[in-house]
Amino acid sequence: VLNNIFIDCVPSLYIDARGLGWMADSPLRWIKEAEEKGTILGIAYNQPPYSTRYPKLANILNDEPKAPKGNVISRNICVGGYWDKPAGFWNASIENKARPYLTMEDNVVAPSSGVKDSLSKSFVIADPLFVNQKNPEQGKYQLDANSPALKRGFKQLPFGKIGLYQSD
């Protein structure tokens, strides 16, 4: 989850540890298939194009295959809603069993957003400083040059290049 802007999302994130809990049997079937056929759900995960596009995938069975490893949550902005705080139907936006396996860094969460742990080092609570503070959408969600998100590596989103293109 890299370089996103979450506006009034409840929750902004949802990451569970299903392989360590209620779905613990499913990974066992995938592990058996990988050992017998060299595939997971019929996909040759350890061969191109998967092994070249996702090099860490080739070793997925060698290091706690049931754990939600490899998830990176970095350089995101959250305004309103809930960043990592449980809300409504969701018992947890980030399951506690999953947290030790995550890499979370350089995220900016606006003071108006709900957070589970305000002392977390995975984010800073700060105004992201949209160019058009009163109506970020009208300002195409562009950030002021002094934005704390830009200082943490967030890249401006190219909204002018996103969307439908006319066919030739």
Label each PLM-derived region with a short phrase.
Residues 65, 119-168:
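C-terminal accessory segments
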